[in-house]
Amino acid sequence: MFEVNPVLNKLKELSERTELLRGYLDYDAKKERLEEVNAELEQPDVWNEPERAQALGKERVALENVVGTIDTLTQGADDVAMLVELAVEGEDEDTFNEAVAEADVLETKLVDLEFRRMFSGQHDPSDCYIDIQSGSGGTEAQDWANMVLRMYLRWGDAHGYKPELIECSEGDVAGIKSATIKFTGEYAFGWLRTETGVHRLVRKSPFDSGGRRHTSFCSVFVYPEIDDDIDIEINPADLRIDVYRASGAGGQHVNRTESAVRITHIPTGVVVQCQNDRSQHKNKDQCMKQLKAKLYELEIQKQNAEKQALEETKSDIGWGSQIRSYVLDDARIKDLRTGVETRNTQAVLDGDLDKFIEASLKSGL
């Protein structure tokens, strides 16, 4: 005799959760918008404006993810219920086991969609940048900044975000002083936005002949790439533009000409750099895009900080807030906001950050 009730109960719960998501995610409006986007992309002159066509293509993927998944879940629950009915009628154990497996697959899809619901911020679907800056502490801190850079590059590769090293300034002896990475892909900013803050390393330094324990800090700042139609006024008189010869690891790919660009926004002290192209003009354009995005995100964070101060919320989004502690001697990495920790330090340093990121998103940071 088959255990039918647990499967039917699961299907009922899946259907109820799917209906809730249908409302939360505004399924009807998204389906209507998807039809509009598809119609626009079918126009023969759509590629006369390549940037708009690319934006529409990106929007279509995001809409299809929601609409298609909800359609799959709705139809899938009906199909599995029918399989269960057929299995019971025919006393067919293989068909029943297939139905159980299909129900599990549907639940996985639903959990993934429920998780995506946390990406409700205006810029969560956007590409993003991560700025990494070593703290005080000389070579040890610069080596730590390089470890953090490697960690995020590995994470980006594993998640298909095509990480691109926009700028990297070598350390005096080892490691790096600073770096900027661009992540391209759906919900890049949504995934990474809670990584902003100070990351603290405690270990026996390989650069200390006495093998003493050192504490080093590294600042991480995540900001979304913003649309050109968002108006950020930047007065050219407020900018200091420097050109210099590129430095940093990269072998034959390092730009050896004096085309690297650094732009300082004097009123705020914000600095952006780009050295990944041989064209000074292209590097300057990239710097201006980063500056615009960074000033926008800083303004949003300032507004959020003021709002949170009024509401006395628990989370400090300030640049100086310490978010995670990496104590390598004790084999322990702990998120100071959520309490999540792991002893598999090497896996985390190799880019396995999902446990920490998911916990911070679920807690509404």
Swiss-Prot record:
Q: Which InterPro entries match?
A: PCRF, Pep_chain_release_fac_I, Pep_chain_release_fac_I_sf, PrfB
Q: Which residues form a coiled coil?
A: none
Tell me yes or no: is Nucleotide-binding among this UniProt entry's keywords. no
Q: How is it modified after translation?
A: Methylated by PrmC. Methylation increases the termination efficiency of RF2.
Q: What terms describe the molecular function in GO for this protein?
A: translation release factor activity, codon specific
Q: Which family does it belong to?
A: Belongs to the prokaryotic/mitochondrial release factor family.
Q: Which HAMAP family match?
A: Rel_fac_2
Q: Where in the cell is it found?
A: Cytoplasm
Looking at the UniProt record for this protein, which Gene Ontology cellular component terms does it annotate, in alphabetical order? cytoplasm
Q: Gene symbol?
A: prfB
Matches recorded under SUPFAM superfamilies: Release factor (SSF75620)
Q: What is the lineage of its organism?
A: Bacteria, Pseudomonadati, Pseudomonadota, Gammaproteobacteria, Aeromonadales
Q: What does this protein do?
A: Peptide chain release factor 2 directs the termination of translation in response to the peptide chain termination codons UGA and UAA.
Q: Keywords in alphabetical order, please.
A: Cytoplasm, Methylation, Protein biosynthesis
User: What is the protein name stated in its UniProt record?
Assistant: Peptide chain release factor 2
Modification sites for N5-methylglutamine: 252
Organism of derivation:
Aeromonas hydrophila subsp. hydrophila (strain ATCC 7966 / DSM 30187 / BCRC 13018 / CCUG 14551 / JCM 1027 / KCTC 2358 / NCIMB 9240 / NCTC 8049)
